[in-house]
Amino acid sequence: MTSTVKTPLPAVDDLAPQWYVIDAADQRLGRLAAEIARILRGKNKAIYTPHMDTGDFVIVINAEKVTVTGKKRSQKLYRRHSGRPGGMKIETFDQLQARIPERIIEHAVKGMLPKNSLGRKLFTKLKVYAGPEHPHQAQKPQPLTINTIPGA
């Protein structure tokens, strides 16, 4: 017995991506990254299709003010390797936040996206800025408030 149920695919008109701006000031890193990944993936929409890019663009401002709980500020490590022998570099959350605060949110969100070509395409829709300014005013981004602090 064969099934005749077709997978509903969203129309091209429905795929018009929105632009959202999220303020990361005083937000928890992991909860914020999970919500950003959900929006990039398009899981907040009724037309979500796993193998298609149905997500929206996300602009994150004030990345330098993102917070973590517990001792992660001094104990969470970020590793990178140059590819050369002895080229491993290790930084703590504090050190990386002082040097490149955007990289922290990018690293967290990238780990929550698919590890394939679709995930790489979705990652290009994330724009992270350390301060409160961004160059995407022409896209008319809508402010999106995310509460990542439980009980607040």
Curated annotation (Swiss-Prot):
Organism: Thermosynechococcus vestitus (strain NIES-2133 / IAM M-273 / BP-1)
S-adenosyl-L-methionine recorded as keyword: no
Family statement drawn from the similarity comment of this UniProt entry: Belongs to the universal ribosomal protein uL13 family.
Single biological process term from Gene Ontology: negative regulation of translation
Feature: compositional bias, Polar residues: 139-152
InterPro entries in alphabetical order: Ribosomal_uL13, Ribosomal_uL13_bac-type, Ribosomal_uL13_CS, Ribosomal_uL13_sf
Keyword Ribosomal protein set for record: yes
Quaternary structure, from the entry: Part of the 50S ribosomal subunit.
Role played: This protein is one of the early assembly proteins of the 50S ribosomal subunit, although it is not seen to bind rRNA by itself. It is important during the early stages of 50S assembly.
GO cellular component: cytosolic large ribosomal subunit
Record-level Gene Ontology MF annotations: mRNA binding; structural constituent of ribosome
CDD domains: Ribosomal_L13
UniProt protein name: Large ribosomal subunit protein uL13
